[in-house]
Curated annotation (Swiss-Prot):
Record domain GST N-terminal: where: 2-82
GO molecular function, one term: glutathione transferase activity
Gene name for this UniProt entry: Gstt2
Domain of life of the source: Eukaryota
Family recorded in the similarity comment: Belongs to the GST superfamily. Theta family.
GO BP of this protein: glutathione metabolic process; response to salicylic acid
Reaction(s) the record says it catalyses: RX + glutathione = an S-substituted glutathione + a halide anion + H(+)
Residue stretches in coiled coil: none
Name recorded for this polypeptide: Glutathione S-transferase theta-2
PANTHER family: GLUTATHIONE S-TRANSFERASE THETA-2-RELATED, PTHR43917
List of residues binding glutathione: 40-41, 53-54, 66-67, 104-107
GO cellular component: cytoplasm; cytosol; nucleus
Pfam entry (one): GST_C
Subunit structure: Homodimer.
């Protein structure tokens, strides 16, 4: 069997992997794992990834379970354009510099609104307002550092061309936008960067990948989202409790 990607497009890293594969014409079999329905907790999926998370890449018997590793693997195996993951040592190091910072400062911060506005209420949990406010402040600080440290006078995060760093960052920053927090407002530098990245990726592909998250708030308001099964509640409550 060929390349399989286990994804849920509500997940930021899943979207990054999906967009990358589509943009670069990489053939793959999409295996949708519906997180809201708890499909990641199934015995069948745990045989693919015992960590019970997406995205997952399965290439024959070879399995990868971290989005950055997946993107690097796809870049190398399919010999995509060099700008994505540059061969030049210093340019590549700059991509890794951002990805390291991203994991600590962006990844766990910009997804919190999905939990406070959608996932928590789905299981009857209200996140304290002081946590919501702290998260809002953390996002503002992270955005400022993203601009000051990485974008500066550059067109893209790691230089003058799109890299994996831009794709990973964009997908995280889209998450709060979809949930009613326009964090690009009043930030012309960040807005221009977003427009450049989306123009490169293509409007049609971005719309396709972003549609599930862009519609989730409306679905929640209409109560048309699936309610997570009881076996998912414990892990969801633990994740909510870990919101700083």
């Amino acid at each position: 069997m060929g390349l399989e990607l286990y994804l849920d497009l509500l997940s930021q890293p899943s979207r990054a992997v999906y967009i990358f594969a589509k943009k670069n014409g990489i053939p793959f079999q999409l295996r949708t794992v519906d997180l809201l329905k708890g499909q990641h907790l199934s015995e069948q999926f745990s045989q693919v990834n015992c960590l019970k998370k997406v995205p997952v890449l399965k290439d024959g018997s070879f399995v990868l379970t971290e989005s950055t590793a997946i993107l690097i693997y796809l870049s190398s195996k399919y010999q995509v354009a060099d700008h994505w993951y540059p061969a030049d040592l210093q340019a590549r190091a700059q991509v890794h510099e951002y990805l390291g910072w991203h994991a600590d400062n962006i990844r766990g911060t910009f997804g919190v609104l999905l939990w406070t506005k959608v996932l928590g209420p789905l299981i009857g949990v209200q996140v304290p307002e002081e946590k919501v406010e702290r998260n809002r402040n953390s996002m503002v600080l992270a955005l400022q550092r993203l601009e000051d440290k990485f974008l500066r006078d550059r067109a893209f995060i790691a230089g003058q061309q799109v890299t994996l760093a831009d794709l990973m960052s964009l997908e995280e920053l889209i998450q709060p936008v979809a949930l009613g927090c326009n964090l690009f407002e009043g930030r012309p530098q960040l807005t221009a960067w977003r427009e450049r990245v989306e123009a490169f990726l293509g409007a049609e592909l971005c719309q396709e990948a972003h549609n599930p998250i862009m519609s989730v708030l409306g679905q929640a308001a209409k109560k048309t989202l699936p309610v997570p099964p009881p076996e998912a509640h414990a892990s969801m409550m633990l994740r909510i409790a870990r919101i700083p």
